[in-house]
Curated annotation (Swiss-Prot):
Name of the protein this chain belongs to: Hyaluronoglucosaminidase
Reactions mediated catalytically: Random hydrolysis of (1->4)-linkages between N-acetyl-beta-D-glucosamine and D-glucuronate residues in hyaluronate
Role according to the record: Putative virulence factor which is likely to act on connective tissue during gas gangrene.
Effect of I944V: In strain: CPN50
Enzyme Commission (EC) number: 3.2.1.35
Effect upon mutating A548E: In strain: CPN50
One GO BP: carbohydrate derivative metabolic process
Domain Dockerin: 1573-1628
Amino acid sequence: MNKNIRKIITSTVLAAMTISVLPSNLVVFATDGITENFYEIYPKPQEISYSGGEFQISDEINIVYDDGIDTYTKKRVDEVLEASNLEATVSNEIVPGKTNFLVGINESGGVVDNYFNKNIPHDESFFDEKMDANIVSVKDGVIGVIGEDTDSAFYGVTTLKHVFNQLEEGNKIQSFRADDYAEVAHRGFIEGYYGNPWSNEDRAELMKFGGDYKLNQYVFAPKDDPYHNSKWRDLYPEEKLSEIKKLAQVGNETKNRYVYALHPFMNNPVRFDTEENYQNDLGVIKAKFTQLLENDVRQFAILADDASAPAQGASMYVKLLTDLTRWLEEQQSTYPDLKTDLMFCPSDYYGNGSSAQLKELNKAEDNVSIVMTGGRIWGEVDENFANNFMNNISTEGHPGRAPFFWINWPCSDNSKQHLIMGGNDTFLHPGVDPSKIDGIVLNPMQQAEANKSALFAIADYAWNIWDNKEEADENWNDSFKYMDHGTAEETNSSLALREISKHMINQNMDGRVRPLQESVELAPKLEAFKQKYDSGASIKEDALELIAEFTNLQKAADYYKNNPGNERTRDQIIYWLNCWEDTMDAAIGYLKSAIAIEEGDDEAAWANYSEAQGAFEKSKTYGFHYVDHTEYAEVGVQHIVPFIKSMGQNLSVVIGSIVDPNRIIATYISNRQDAPTGNPDNIFDNNASTELVYKNPNRIDVGTYVGVKYSNPITLNNVEFLMGANSNPNDTMQKAKIQYTVDGREWIDLEEGVEYTMPGAIKVENLDLKVRGVRLIATEARENTWLGVRDINVNKKEDSNSGVEFNPSLIRSESWQVYEGNEANLLDGDDNTGVWYKTLNGDTSLAGEFIGLDLGKEIKLDGIRFVIGKNGGGSSDKWNKFKLEYSLDNESWTTIKEYDKTGAPAGKDVIEESFETPISAKYIRLTNMENINKWLTFSEFAIISDELENAGNKENVYTNTELDLLSLAKEDVTKLIPTDDISLNHGEYIGVKLNRIKDLSNINLEISNDTGLKLQSSMNGVEWTEITDKNTLEDGRYVRLINTSNEAVNFNLTKFEVNSNEVYEPSLVDAYVGDDGAKKAVDGDLKTRVKFLGAPSTGDTIVYDLGQEILVDNLKYVVLDTEVDHVRDGKIQLSLDGETWTDAITIGDGVENGVDDMFSTPLKNGYKHGNQSGGIVPIDSAYVEGDNLNQKARYVRILFTAPYRHRWTVINELMINNGEYISTVNDPTYISNPIEERGFAPSNLRDGNLTTSYKPNTNNGEISEGSITYRLSEKTDVRKVTIVQSGSSISNAKVMARVGDGSENVTDQWVQLGTLSNSLNEFINRDYNNIYEIKIEWTDVAPNIYEIITLNQEFEFPVNDSLKAKYDELINLSGDEYTLSSFETLKEALNEAKSILDDSNSSQKKIDKALEKLNKAEERLDLRATDFEDFNKVLTLGNSLVEEEYTAESWALFSEVLEAANEANKNKADYTQDQINQIVIDLDASIKALVKETPEVDKTNLGELINQGKSLLDESVEGFNVGEYHKGAKDGLTVEINKAEEVFNKEDATEEEINLAKESLEGAIARFNSLLIEESTGDFNGNGKIDIGDLAMVSKNIGSTTNTSLDLNKDGSIDEYEISFINHRILN
């Protein structure tokens, strides 16, 4: 085909904004070297050529139709002409003198067919070989279309519709010819998504849109239509039929036909068990189809997706389809336009053709299209898939057929929050062989109008498959014009829509779908900004550039919101348009905050941060209905939103220090741009076995640094850098030095002139420096190396609270290299993480190689636990023969045990040894005993030591004595180590301080003497309660034993244990095999999943601890609906104690499934589809459930009742009570009523992170009031409380405090501190010694609270004495003496000062600013003017002057001064004497500068006279003949005209000059007129003729100057001129 394409790039700028747009590419074709204005036609014609000519379309058109052209095609012609306001009549012949519009069918023998045969050369095979073939010819006043049939002709007319939409004024049309056809037979879209169904208006509009671009199928398969699926056996009621009929008629009219899809396989499916049942069910389908045929439906489809295949096999599909084909063929006699093509979607719709089902289905007749999704649910139109499918599906005698692609794009079922506004070349691959495609339908979004860009793409692609990505991009770029207003014209609205759509493309899904790229131009700018921000460099200019970008996007969204080309589109995407506004406010606000931080403006930094935070929260509130719940719009999900989140997180550190001045946050910094392996938290964990390793690039440049920055200055006493990777200590800098910063920007060398070579461990002490950061920076480059960072320790304390230190580190053979994993995995307590080592010596591990632990000091060991091998890659890379050894000096080793694992299966080997007599060791290792040709894998190393376990520390000891006590703490118990010979004096105590306030369950206390001792508990260390019953306890953090007697008490402490009730996160207890992330099964996220890495056997179990006792009413086991690793036979059971189990769910029949079940999906094994869960389970998932269980449980397990050797086990979620949120912590520090929302825990109130928050669960607004209480457990001497809430939802909640002075005899009380009326709320407490609890009570508006900050003695109470003194000094001033404006400024400052003085919560900064403002207002007080004598005189004079008497220029200056003077006169009380005096000087000067106006003269007559003279010159000729003028006559007149023009053009010409010029010119004109030659001119002797006598008279007077009667040319003398004139007259 001819695809000689030229692109014309145009760019349009929005009138109301600046929008950066992609080029608008127009498809044009060059012929014969002629350049014309070519038409933009979609879908692109296969061949088009322009002849270079054009013609005018006549006002009235003559239309000629061949027989066979249907009414729908004729109606399309009418639409085309009416749109251009053209009238037409229909005739049977071409009419000369008119534009003829011809529409015909090839080989019809009609007028149009004959015209094309005679005038438009073409090959008849073109119509036989091509689909939907048509030719459009425009030339010589004839606009002609001929098609293979009426549908093809319709497509040709549709081509002309796009041409006519581009006609210029005057209706001129270019001459061209288009030979066109479709490359794919079936082109359209299917309503098969799971969201809200479209309205009939939506459906009709999309069918019309598709018809404009030659789509030919809309497949009706909405999930909510019961007659399509659940009630497929029932006929439609009449009211539903009328709706279907209307849509069918729209489909017939647009040729985008309504295809009715029936799903008879999911609910009460078609029966194939007996012929009688089958025939009965076939009859049901025929009756249904007959009903629809009678209502204009002309095409059908059968769906079997997401349903079980017939038990009798896939041949039943073929049987049904064949019988339906026969029946449809029979019906064609009644309905000639009925299509017998049958779409069929099998249950294996995401297969690759290799299944027995699809091979059998390939035996169906050729009219059957086999619908496939491209090899996976979110598949693509891909030639590789098509080739594989066709090859796999073929069997002997049945060659493979091309797939009919069902493409789930732009479907957003699994990305409901987003609009999918792009992805052309991702889902529709360029260059695919069209013979490999039977058809394509897109499955769109529930937002009908938003699909038009994708429908525009499939229309273009399926008609004329794109050759390359550029064509796909061009289509995307142009689509928004047609989506917005349906023509090729670019408008502000289409530009705006395209601009925001650039950033609404990505699906934000998992690996099951190829991610679509959005924000392509913006993303690199965002990344560059983040890197620059992280580096600490100035970001102001970059931030301003990004603000411009985001403002542009915000304006684009706003423009489209208010100026849509299509209001339906605007209304359907309004949630996203609104979201754009707030999302951009958030981005802009964060950037402005960053700028303010750089400029040191704390108030602006907080204000912008708070507004941004509120805007971002608000952006998540634009909810739209989705089936049975609300979803919330999100834009810019791939790059913009992550950028906003990143900025919010980064800024929160700095803003946090503004909100809480005493808060110090450490942040790891580096200018490496690659993502390291490991977690940045590893840097500060004081554990050298954890690390970060930078690998790409594998070099270290000069200037590369790693370090730490602080939100506020700290005192740096010592710093330690542990560099190099654990796998290779040489992965460090070649040379480096340490630097510190005081201001966060400028870096200073810590040790002048000191450099470290190949630093491994560096420590510098005794510094005593105030710093904001410290770093290690490379001073010399190093190639071929990674960069490892193990720890950065600042102000590390060498002393320890613990009785025994334990800091193990890894030891191993140095020749090994880490191939996969992180060595920190060996010490993380998780058997499912590990390391894979590459061995040297020809991939051989030599005898004597080892791996183990350096315990750091001699420790008594009671046991060891080593896990050799791992699951997954390298699972068989293990030693066969090895031994366990220990040593005290790393030289002399003692063997504990030898092992022979020869023949052991792949996977993990757990080595566990217990020692009856503890072993004292500092080193312990495994050592290889034979050479083995393998790499090596290890998963976990651990020791068991009662000495360590019971060593204790001082962290939880609570005492006011010098006793050497030690404590031990676990989550649910805190205790003191037994101690003898304790002596307590009066008021002394011993006890424990728990890690937080706890729900105390009981206390175990055993002492030898309790005389005079009392046991007490407290939540806060101030208020104490005596404990009388150790099993009935209040919440508390402190428990103490205090001597209340007056005598010393001596005793031995045998037991002091405080127990608490705790709940935990769900966790794995046990499983039959290892896994790749057990927590994912109980994390509440159905997108994550755990795989247990082995096939189950009968009796195998997977056991989870729910973390607490739960009343389970509903239990679901959820997996993806495509998951082949699902449980086939098993029971899911519940237990309260982990011993006694009750069945909740039964799966399968307990009989092992065969190998043929290996690729079966959950639905085929009896699971329910997600769409049956009422929105609880996603529609891409399947589940089994137990309902109405009403059982208390702590444990849940899967018990396998039959083996399945061919698959492992996957769990996406074990869902309790339909995903109901259950808190996984029992923390009485907070009391939330109602309970919080998931992810908004009360602990967020005190986590120091301004990006996390607490939010109560109002059950979608049903709960309208509540409270949250924060109980302080220490530092109750609070001076200031700061509460930060979301700026987007100001709650105005009451802030209450329970206060007291700490005295035993004084009762506490609740007082109100204030209300949450702002985003940042500050409350100062001067009146109470202690605040024990803070309670926030809300009504109507539930708060979203980021942080509660309390400040104690470090907060200095604001001092307002100076402000009050200045206020008192100025408040009584009288305004009579001062100018009004200066005194008004003072009043404003006084009012502000009073407001601040009256507000007990005013900060020092506010007080200081108010004082500064008051002082400035006082300084600027101006005394009023009193002397106006001169002012009045000069003003009176000025007002008396008349404007007309002076020049405009001088008056303009004067009038400005006069206006100012008059203004001063009106407001004399607002002027100082100096100002009045200056006005007098200025006004007097401007009066003196006035220039008198010269009277204007009238030049009209002179001008007219000049024009008269010029006319005479133009009309006259000099010569000797009658009617001519004497020679030289013009010269005299010309001279005078020039003189007159000089005067006329002189701006300051006087009236006298004008009159003189006029008189001179009048005389010149009179003289000129007197020189006109008449018949008698020269007849001096009066004889009535010119003769010799006249010549004699002239000759006689030659030289005379007095005889004027003979002077013909009036030059003052008789000369040769008169002789020549007389001679000429005599001779002629």
